[in-house]
């Protein structure tokens, strides 16, 4: 509990004790009045002070004003009627403060969920000076510096491992508990926790530009983007509160005046009491507090799951998503070429890969890199001579004095070598040794492990259509789309063509359209869609800048989880709106008719607020979605 919350709690206890003393010992007269007024001032002083300040500043119509008018009015009515019953006035303030304390604690719990993410902020960086480790502020570490991260410490800046190996805990960033390995040459990002070995890292970004700073900035700014529901409640409260004050005044004055005109007793006490009850019931705090809290909790729950949403307006839009468009590479596929097959080989597969990897050793093309990875052995460039790259065809070279040709079917035709066609989907690399065909290698962009499951999960989450856009050839695109059960596929697209396809889908879509990309070269499409989702954004500034929703790892299943989180949050928001307005509307009518008394008004105010707040913090629970 905060210091302020403890103070309110002590005021609640003191007031409850004073009221209990008065009731238990049946203290009446002046002593009873003094004790009731003391209890009222103890519990209500803070509210009265806020109401007075609001009047001075011209901000009259808020919940403090309503509570002050209602309770002071109830005391005045008790004095006027000489009943000596000040219990209702004290009870209104007491239960209102209990409700306020409860919602303050709930907001604090929700805020702690978000600020738990702030634990990724590193407090220091270790640098070596004169053979000793010195702790410095991460802001003071220049790009290109060597920092040392010991087991149990957070990585303070993005960089590349130059020495050492370890496992990294990325749970605070991705929501996943599975550690990741890091060794020399691997890129690492700030915010991860080093678990086992000592790492030396050469920094590649200043602290202000590092991943941890970008994420914290995004989270801290998320509350500034209000949803339509929040804006509606804000506007509603500005109109609603003055309206009910006027309504209460009319209820207190008009019926007695009408009765006097009719020659009857004005019965002022009854109608003023009803008006005061009307004021207590009408307090809009259940809506004003629970709706923003629902979104705040939803954003916090999403953050814990590794889904960063830039504002509640995007959370609301995400909940209405009916069409999801994917960029293939890096989203549904891993975006890394791998050797998947070797066919028609006239020598052992390992030897085929060795010849191909050696012939391609001088090339930096992704296909060359994939051949070298598949071979896995040491590349001795001294074994390779007479390398000739034939543009658009492939490479010829001598490996250990043997003529080797590696390339596409055009290279085989050019050299007059008969080759075998391949029905596998992917890039086909043919190999010839001393003019004789030696087989071909199939290289493919591998589908992500959970991609098919992710498409099915989107359907279960209520997404009506899934679309895949790619610059790849039609045969490859159709194969991937068929394997994943994607509804619609468009291939051989340039970046401008992808924007055009999204424009067309937007015009046809019944509901909101989300575009999912890796955030690196998808900025135009991410910004054009109703909601842009960037995947695998750890370390990608472009993704964090361009997207509305950032998934911190490469798991496509997080997309459906993000949609389910948003829908749960909006469902809670609508439940609270309907519940609060329904109960208050009913009690307002009953209060005006004299059926609902001040105790019913207390439930309609504090009880409804507590129930709505309890419902709101359910948005934090996202583990089972």
Model-derived features: positions:
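Juxtamembrane coupling segments of multi-pass membrane pumps/enzymes
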Residues: 65-66, 91-151, 182, 309, ...
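Membrane-embedded transport module
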Residues: 247, 508, 547, 552-625
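Conserved catalytic phosphorylation-site environment of P-type ATPases
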Residues: 63-71, 173, 273, 283-359, ...
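Bilayer-spanning, highly hydrophobic alpha-helical transmembrane segments
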Residues: 16, 232-262, 277-295, 574-603
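Conserved ATP-binding TGD loop and adjacent catalytic N/P-domain core of P-type ATPases
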Residues: 401, 427, 433-575, 583
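Conserved cytosolic catalytic loops of P-type ATPases
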Residues: 116-209, 313-356, 398-399
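Transmembrane helix-loop-helix hairpins at the membrane interface
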Residues: 2-124, 226, 235, 242, ...
């Amino acid at each position: 509990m905060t210091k302020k919350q403890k103070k309110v709690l002590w005021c609640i206890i003191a007031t409850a004790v004073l009221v209990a003393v008065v009731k238990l010992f049946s203290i009446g007269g002046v002593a009873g009045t003094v004790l009731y007024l003391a209890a009222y001032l103890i519990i209500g002083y803070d509210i009265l002070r806020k109401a007075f300040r609001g009047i001075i500043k011209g901000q009259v119509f808020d919940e403090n004003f309503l509570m002050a008018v209602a309770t002071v009015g109830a005391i005045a009515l008790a004095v006027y009627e000489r009943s000596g019953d000040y219990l209702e006035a004290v009870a209104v303030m007491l239960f209102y403060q209990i409700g306020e304390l409860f919602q303050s604690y709930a907001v604090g719990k929700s805020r702690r969920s978000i600020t738990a993410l702030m634990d990724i902020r590193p407090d220091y960086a270790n640098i070596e000076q004169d053979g000793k480790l010195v702790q410095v502020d991460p802001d003071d570490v220049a790009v290109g510096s060597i920092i040392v991260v010991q087991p149990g410490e957070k990585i303070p800046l993005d960089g590349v491992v130059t020495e050492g190996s370890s496992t990294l805990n990325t749970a605070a960033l991705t929501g996943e508990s599975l550690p990741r390995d890091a060794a020399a040459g691997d890129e690492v990002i700030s915010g991860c926790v080093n678990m086992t070995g000592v790492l030396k890292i050469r920094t590649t970004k200043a602290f202000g530009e590092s991943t941890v700073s970008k994420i914290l900035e995004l989270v801290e700014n998320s509350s500034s983007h209000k949803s339509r529901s929040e804006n509606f409640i804000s506007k509603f409260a500005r109109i609603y509160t003055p309206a009910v004050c006027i309504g209460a005044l009319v209820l207190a004055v008009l019926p007695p005046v009408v009765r006097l005109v009719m020659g009857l007793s004005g019965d002022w006490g009854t109608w003023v009491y009803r008006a005061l009850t009307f004021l207590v019931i009408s307090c809009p705090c259940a809506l004003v507090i629970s709706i923003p809290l629902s979104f705040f909790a939803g954003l916090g729950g999403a953050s814990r799951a590794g889904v960063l949403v830039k504002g509640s307006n995007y959370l609301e839009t995400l909940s209405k998503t009916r069409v999801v468009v994917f960029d293939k590479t890096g989203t549904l596929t891993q975006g890394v070429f791998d050797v998947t097959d070797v066919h028609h080989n006239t020598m052992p597969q390992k030897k085929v890969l060795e010849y191909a990897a050696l012939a391609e050793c001088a090339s930096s093309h992704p296909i060359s890199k994939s051949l070298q990875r598949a071979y896995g052995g040491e590349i001795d460039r001294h074994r390779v001579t007479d390398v000739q790259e034939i543009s658009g065809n492939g490479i010829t070279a001598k490996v250990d004095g043997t003529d080797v040709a590696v390339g596409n079917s055009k290279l085989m035709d050019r050299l007059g070598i008969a080759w075998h066609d391949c029905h596998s989907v992917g890039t086909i690399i043919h190999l010839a040794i001393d003019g004789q065909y030696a087989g071909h290698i199939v290289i493919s962009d591998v589908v992500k492990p959970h991609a098919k499951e992710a498409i099915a999960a989107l359907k279960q989450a209520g997404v009506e259509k899934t679309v895949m856009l790619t610059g790849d050839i039609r045969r490859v695109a159709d194969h991937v789309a068929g394997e994943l059960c994607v509804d619609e596929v468009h291939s051989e697209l340039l970046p401008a063509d992808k924007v055009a396809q999204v424009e067309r889908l937007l015009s046809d879509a019944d509901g909101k359209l989300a575009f999912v990309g890796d955030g690196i070269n998808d900025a135009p499409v991410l910004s054009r869609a109703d909601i842009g989702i960037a995947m695998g954004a750890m370390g990608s500034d472009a993704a964090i800048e361009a997207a509305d929703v950032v998934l911190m790892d490469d798991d496509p299943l997080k997309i459906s989880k993000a949609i389910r989180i948003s829908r749960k949050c909006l469902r809670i928001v609508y439940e609270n709106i309907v519940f609060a307005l329904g109960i208050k509307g009913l009690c307002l009518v009953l209060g005006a008719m004299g059926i609902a008394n001040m105790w019913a008004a207390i439930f309609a105010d504090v009880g409804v607020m507590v129930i709505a707040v309890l419902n709101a913090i359910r948005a934090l629970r996202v583990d089972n979605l």
